[in-house]
Amino acid sequence: AIAGYLKIDEAKIKKAIAGFKGVKRRFEYIVKSGSHILIDDYAHHPEELRALLNGAKELYPNKKCTVVFQPHLYTRTRDLADGFAEVLAIADEVVLLPIYPARELPIEGVSSEMILNKINKSSKRVLQKTELVDWVKSNNTELLITAGAGDIDLLLNDLKLMLEKKR
């Protein structure tokens, strides 16, 4: 409507919409091949994770869904651990990375294990960031989702290269 009001050519509008690739780190496809899918998302709250995981499972109902989540902030992890555990259990397999502290100092007793212990699922683990690529390489990850507001996105290039070789 605004474009029409501003008298922008309709062909230019259609071309711009067709070329729009979405927002970075919101259900962003990093790898999309027949055998492997890697999606990255900034989700760092249980409701964002719920939308992400439900959407992915709806799009790919026949693929095993593995989520790699990096909790963001000790206070958020402490306050929302139950919600994170409930929502992460939507995935078939859960990998937690250590908490990204951002501006916070550690809080005694608050860690990714706090969430892990509340997840009602056997296929779950905590890995260090340095272990993730090798773990993915040695496991069958059909639909891999990385999520978090920390620095988890720094692993994407290595994950992408490894998955592309794995085809």
Located regions from the model:
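A short, gly/pro- and small-residue-rich
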Residues: S111-I119, N157-R167
